[in-house]
């Protein structure tokens, strides 16, 4: 284990032990009833996804929306890559090789996508983590850990090489996007993926690309009297400070890569981002609010609790800082504030003002599944408070009550917001659909059983310490 990885692991243990205060229960005390209930729902989701799978010449695909089966994406957010990650997680939870075979079928299709440049060349976000080929790489790495065929690892090498070819020297570093800084669409996500590959495979080329991408992002910082922030888009002054499109996500990437590469300038950039987040935070009565953003009238006075624009995601940034030893004491305070707030804003019901009901109530990106995932991870293999268990179980029940369950299958039908096209939808993916809800439920199952997370997404600070062991060996193939 390299020194940087060892440091992250040691700090993560301290983080888990120190963050959560007085405890009155442990996961072992919860019994196996909740574990069985969670796994049953996760497998019902898997059966529904399997029932919507389509076999083609290259492998297995799923429609992004089961009610509109003609739209099939390859990406991590909504497409095939996300379902591949889910079936690998389900395999890890159950040991059922049929789930791994389903994941391999999806991974075979993704390899075919990489062989056909027309699949992604016209995508302006082609390099990105959630909407480009970096997300394909995440899915392939999940499969390669368990597959005997090394072709998935070779395809990851191909992605790293392609990202190297696409990179553009700019501002003392490298970029891939002409427009986006952020985690979902932009250079932050691409650089994070490359660091993820480096951690799992000891790929020095990937780490060099990641580090240079982080240095470009460092140059995109907007200085203020209280720290630095990053715009979502370079051509428009949209300041969305939370995780998915702004400062928390970009600074998360700087903290991650800075720690892996032992680059103090990147760690300092993450610290400046944290200083800015602290400066805009509103703390009252032990509750934390972080504004949605600035740049559109509709964002004024808006606060959310979800992964994308609220506390569930930005708490991951605070956790990454603490794990990485960057302003660890202050970061611990903000982890605690985030936790206390989520426990006291009336979830899983209508959130207490000024927190708003998000555009998608249940999903992993905006809604309650993101909170469930975070709460579950906070209690992995550690003592856990009654309050966390109560909210965790209440969110699971809320999600179950909204599900359509027939013939041992489960899915959700929702009214899609206008920015997603409107109408009724039964989404299948990680961001808005069954796979994302399923991953949150599997996080709960893992936490009850004291297990490591079954999935290891790059933007999850909790999964990295135990799961990245430089043992995939892709460069040997």
Language-model segments: residues:
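Glycan-recognition and catalytic cores of secretory/periplasmic carbohydrate-active enzymes
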Residues: 28-477
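Intrinsically disordered/low-complexity terminal segments and short unstructured peptides
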Residues: 8, 23-25
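Bacterial N-terminal signal peptides
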Residues: 11-21
């Amino acid at each position: 284990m390299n020194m940087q990885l060892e440091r992250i692991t040691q700090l993560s243990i301290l983080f888990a032990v120190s963050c959560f205060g007085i405890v009155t229960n442990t996961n072992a005390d919860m019994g196996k009833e909740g574990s069985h209930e969670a796994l049953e729902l996760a497998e019902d989701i898997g059966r529904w996804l399997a029932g919507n799978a389509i076999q083609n010449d290259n492998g297995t695909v799923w429609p992004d929306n089961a009610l509109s089966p003609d739209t099939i994406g390859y990406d991590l957010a909504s497409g095939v890559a996300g379902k591949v990650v889910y079936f690998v997680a389900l395999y890890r939870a159950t040991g059922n090789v049929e789930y791994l075979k389903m994941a391999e079928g999806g991974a075979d299709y993704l390899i075919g996508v990489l062989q056909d440049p027309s699949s992604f060349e016209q995508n302006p976000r082609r390099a990105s983590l959630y909407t480009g080929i970096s997300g394909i790489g995440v899915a392939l790495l999940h499969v390669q850990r368990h597959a005997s065929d090394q072709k998935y690892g070779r395809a990851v090498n191909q992605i790293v090489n392609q990202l190297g070819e696409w990179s553009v020297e700019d501002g003392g570093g490298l970029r891939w996007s002409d427009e986006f800084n952020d985690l979902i669409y932009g250079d932050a996500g691409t650089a994070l993926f490359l660091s993820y590959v480096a951690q799992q495979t000891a790929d020095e080329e990937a780490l060099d690309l990641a580090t240079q991408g982080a240095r470009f992002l460092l140059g995109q910082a907007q200085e203020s009297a209280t720290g630095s922030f990053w715009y979502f888009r370079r051509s428009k002054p949209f300041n969305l400070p939370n995780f998915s499109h702004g400062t928390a996500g970009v600074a998360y990437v700087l903290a991650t890569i800075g720690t892996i590469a032992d680059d103090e300038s990147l760690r300092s950039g993450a610290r400046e981002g944290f200083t800015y987040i602290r400066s805009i935070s509103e703390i009252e009565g032990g509750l934390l609010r972080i504004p949605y953003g600035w740049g559109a009238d509709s964002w004024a006075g808006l606060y959310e609790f979800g992964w994308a624009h609220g506390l569930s995601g930005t708490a991951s940034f605070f956790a990454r800082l603490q794990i990485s030893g960057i302003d660890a004491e202050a970061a611990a305070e903000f982890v605690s504030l985030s936790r206390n707030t989520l426990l006291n804003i009336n979830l899983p019901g209508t959130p207490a003002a000024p927190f708003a009901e998000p555009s998608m109530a249940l999903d992993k990106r905006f809604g309650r599944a993101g909170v469930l995932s975070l709460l579950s991870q906070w209690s992995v293999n550690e003592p856990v408070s009654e309050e966390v268990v109560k909210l965790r179980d209440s969110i699971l029940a809320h999600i179950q009550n909204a599900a359509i369950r027939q013939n041992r299958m489960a899915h959700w039908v929702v009214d899609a917001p206008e920015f997603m096209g409107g109408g009724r939808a039964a989404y299948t993916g990680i961001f808005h659909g069954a796979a994302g809800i399923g991953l949150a439920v599997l996080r709960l199952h893992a936490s009850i059983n004291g297990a490591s997370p079954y999935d290891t997404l790059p933007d999850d600070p909790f999964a990295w310490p135990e799961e990245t062991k430089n043992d995939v060996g892709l460069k040997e193939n």
